[in-house]
């Protein structure tokens, strides 16, 4: 079998592109051919009132463009099972259209960012999720529009 490049991960016989949540947030608005069919992202579990009522949670990571004053918590809705608030997860999945965009409205601000933005068009269909230690640098500073992504 061919080796999997470092920009990808192999799980259960499927190949996933590694990218960060901010990159995925930006790519989700592009033509479908530009969005990875399967991906792996790293994020922190957050609870939102509307999401929780629908059996979902927010997978979130703070993106910084210039400085922490302009930080935005980028979020996607996902079924993260019983993962506790604040848990870091490596999530393997794919996108699916969000049937109720109201679920993504007004996500609670995260502890590190005063602004949260939840993707209102798509949710992550979780194929696998693994608890991981918090990253050394929890913030996203780099955004790429093609592979290899910043992960």
Give, region by region, the residue ranges found by the protein language model.
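OB-fold and OB-like single-stranded nucleic-acid-recognition modules
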Residues: 1-151
């Amino acid at each position: 079998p061919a080796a999997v490049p470092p920009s990808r991960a192999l799980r259960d016989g499927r190949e996933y592109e590694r990218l960060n949540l901010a990159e995925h947030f930006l790519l989700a608005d592009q033509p479908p051919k530009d969005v990875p069919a399967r991906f792996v992202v790293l994020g922190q579990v957050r609870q939102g009132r509307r999401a929780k009522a629908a059996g979902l949670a927010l997978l979130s990571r703070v993106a910084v463009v210039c400085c922490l004053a302009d930080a935005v918590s980028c979020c996607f809705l996902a079924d993260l099972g019983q993962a506790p608030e604040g848990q870091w997860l490596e999530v393997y999945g794919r996108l699916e259209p969000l049937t109720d965009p109201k679920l993504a409205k007004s996500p609670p601000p995260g502890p590190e960012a005063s602004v949260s933005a939840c993707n209102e068009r798509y949710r992550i269909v979780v194929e696998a999720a693994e608890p991981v230690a918090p990253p050394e640098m929890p913030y996203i500073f780099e955004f790429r529009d093609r592979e290899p992504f910043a992960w």
